[in-house]
Amino acid sequence: MRVVAGKYKGRKLQFESTEILRPTADIVKEALFTKLQFLFPIEIFVDLFAGTGSIGIEALSRGAKKVFFVEKNHAHVKIIENNLKSLGIDYDKNNHTSNKPAIILTEDFLTALDKFDTKIDIIFIDPPYKSDFYDKSLQILENKNLMQNSGVVVLEVEENKKFNNYNFKIESEKRYGKKHLIYLTNSIV
């Protein structure tokens, strides 16, 4: 696993592929950021259920000013910390108001999102596939009006996953094997 483009292009990232940690493949990551490149540079990117942190690190590499890595699994948090350190990226933990470019939030995703008081430009949501966390994430994003008017929500889902998109508009869906990336926009503009 590596950083695909930008400031840290080609740098390798630490990871372990386990039943609960499924790092996004480089080819999917490249397609994701190619699709989103017109939005960069951006202010706020959120990597929800961050795992290894590779998606958030890619966002930093491509010019995101601040990335929030939301991950409550302590082993995964250690991987994110190691990856940020290996790239020389300054980070803070559990400080929503930090000025550092990377902020690791080691709390439940609902708690983390509930504490946000700033608008999000892009959020990448990749929870455990068998969970109802897609619906819960989208619901809190809508209820708290956390997305910028031009904001994009990206869901990484397995084939045939059903979810409630609330008032978010499905812009496009792209398939990569058994994984799908679904792009949603804020339709409450």
Predicted segment positions?
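Class I S-adenosyl-L-methionine-dependent methyltransferase catalytic core
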Residues: M1-V189
